[in-house]
Design a protein with these regions (language model features):
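Catalytic cores of alpha/beta
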Residues: 15-22, 70-80, 117-128, 173-189
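Hydrophobic faces of well-ordered beta-strands that scaffold small-molecule active sites
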Residues: 2-7, 30-32, 62-66, 86-88, ...
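Short, basic, low-complexity termini and linkers enriched in Ser/Thr/Gly/Pro
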Residues: 50-62, 101-105, 125-129
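A short alpha/beta connector and helix-capping loop motif
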Residues: 38-71, 75-76, 178-196
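Active-site/ligand-binding-proximal alpha/beta "capping" segment
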Residues: 139, 146-188, 194
Length: 208
């Protein structure tokens, strides 16, 4: 099972510092949270131009979690930044084929995310259309929330119904629940506050 450190910040200077730390952990990926304050209650960093300038200097691959109201309107700019994977929310999609076509043309992997109140069944129609699913086990946007235990069943259902998918789980991940989430069927755990709020972020990453 893979662990991807998540970076949930409003300031790009802090993002740059944390990406370099993620590289020092030995992780192959970093997960950047983007929030527009419309789909979410809070606003996070959301400037693709800044990422475009810096990403080519980084050794880690970048995936972006796009928590925005209208992903179709902004996706194109993010696809120019050098990222390798982008998650858009099931709840905000208006034209899936447009998103898929744009990502395909740019060579960027498209994944689908769902918030905690959306049942796994919402993703069944995308079986075979995307390879990555992100189960957000907390409310979108704000770091430091507790994992909602009812999401374990959602992971199990998705794993059973779409066995070939890659399932990422994000939100409230820590050393106490990581094993149960893995057993439920997760392939990748995304962790932010557990890693960054510890006294030793590298050690916290390695413990997961």
């Amino acid at each position: 099972m893979a662990i991807i450190p998540a970076i949930n910040e409003v300031n790009f200077e802090e993002i740059k510092k944390k990406v370099l730390l993620v590289q020092s952990f030995g992780s192959k990926w970093a997960h950047l949270d983007v929030a527009d304050g419309k789909f979410t209650k809070n606003v996070l960093w959301n400037n693709p131009e800044e990422l475009k300038v810096e990403s080519e200097k980084w050794k880690v691959k970048i995936e972006v979690h796009l928590m925005v109201e209208s992903p179709e309107d902004v996706l194109g700019e993010w696809l120019k930044t050098g990222i390798k994977r982008i998650f858009v929310h099931y709840e905000s999609i208006k034209d899936f084929e447009l998103l898929k076509d744009k990502c395909g043309a740019a060579g960027v992997e498209l994944g689908l995310a769902i918030g905690p109140h959306i049942p796994a069944e919402g993703l069944f129609e995308y079986n075979g259309r995307v390879s990555y699913f992100l189960i957000l086990a907390v409310e979108p946007g704000i770091s430091g929330q507790e994992f909602q235990d009812n999401q374990l069943e959602k992971i199990r259902v998705l794993r059973e119904k779409i066995p070939n998918a890659k399932i990422e789980v994000d939100g409230g991940i820590n050393i106490r629940n990581a094993f149960d989430i893995k057993q439920a069927g997760a392939d990748i755990l995304v962790s932010s506050s557990y890693i960054w709020n510890s006294g030793n972020p590298k050690e916290a990453y390695e413990l997961l």
